[in-house]
Amino acid sequence: MSQLVDRRLSGKNRSAVNRQRFLRRFKAQIRKAAAQAVSGRKVADLERGEKISIPSKDLSEPIFHHGPGGRRNVILPGNREFVSGDRIDRPAGEGGGGSGGSPDGEGMDDFVFELSKEEFMDYFFEDLALPDMVKKQLAAVPEVKKSRAGFVSHGNPANLHVVRSMKQAIGRRLAMAAGPREALRQAEEALEALVAEGRGAEPDAEALREEIAALKARVAAVPFIDTWDLRYAHRVDQPVPSSQAVMFCLLDVSGSMDEDRKNIAKRFFMLLYLFLTKSYERIDVVFIRHHTVAKEVDEEEFFSSRESGGTVVSSALELMRDIILARYPTSNWNIYAAQASDGDNWDDDSPRCRDLLLQSILPLTQYFAYVEIEAEEPQSLWREYERVKAASPRFAMQRILALEDIYPVFRELFRKKAA
């Protein structure tokens, strides 16, 4: 019976299995820490690790032990200090008196460990997905395309590769005839030597002639091409991603959006952008900033540049509509949008925003999410968008009143739907 001994060095990941088991066990605590990360630090720093603190009581294993009551008259082995009848004080806990100890000084210190960037992001984006990430016409039959995958010895005659087959035949003939050809050469040289010596009529010469004839017959019997030589071009079905998506991010940077509100809006979109790049490889993200005039910008300018002015939200919606019609046909793209604003808008423009959504944008999109930031009272845009929400299931809206609301609102807007 054979035995395999794995002598490979585990390196720095020698405890990877135990670590994964530990992460699964304390999943609830880790998810709670991930939810607090948005309010505890900048969203731009989400792509790094995180320190997780777990209470010591959650680490303890259930055990059987003697209760605090009852009487025990026993002297344990190794005792040198006590005799029967002595009363022993309960030992103090291990909690330290420093800043990291337990509050009462009698418990155990919390256990703190570091999550890697990948582990933290996995927990952070758990249970999140773009809603309805599928096209109805593509759901039933996945799209595939043929791609080359070398050559095979069996296949459709229409896929016969002549050049590859002839190469195989030449190689086979050379291999099969190599031995007889060498023997034929040696026999012919021996016969020539006998003839040169005048012994061409001797029995040895006749035997060589018979051997030469047999060897020539063997060489001639090697087929020019055989079924073993045939090679066919092989093609396999490669799945083609049937769902490609584009996400529009619309940000209000008008004068009514103060720096605190802009900061919350930027954090929301940065969180959204991290989610998209984490979860989907084939997705476009279009950044649109607007005040009185809308402008498509790159990621850096979207988050960093500062402008001010009035508020005309319809300019951003019109630009989004034009970009969809120009670059993202609905037959090939799933279209999603998220808009962040304080809700302050020119009163005459809010009804136009409602009409643009209902008539031009929502018919082209799968989902449109709107977040209103730090608006104490519903603004005109919010009231018009409530009418949009009542008219279309593709539209969702939430309010963010504080920095701590970003993550819960984000999860509510983009949570997975139960199957």
UniProtKB/Swiss-Prot annotation:
<feature type="region of interest" description="Disordered">
    <location>
        <begin position="85"/>
        <end position="108"/>
    </location>
</feature>
<feature type="compositionally biased region" description="Gly residues">
    <location>
        <begin position="93"/>
        <end position="104"/>
    </location>
</feature>
<dbReference type="InterPro" id="IPR036465">
    <property type="entry name" value="vWFA_dom_sf"/>
</dbReference>
<protein>
    <recommendedName>
        <fullName>UPF0229 protein Tbd_1233</fullName>
    </recommendedName>
</protein>
<dbReference type="InterPro" id="IPR006698">
    <property type="entry name" value="UPF0229"/>
</dbReference>
<dbReference type="Pfam" id="PF04285">
    <property type="entry name" value="DUF444"/>
</dbReference>
<comment type="similarity">
    <text>Belongs to the UPF0229 family.</text>
</comment>
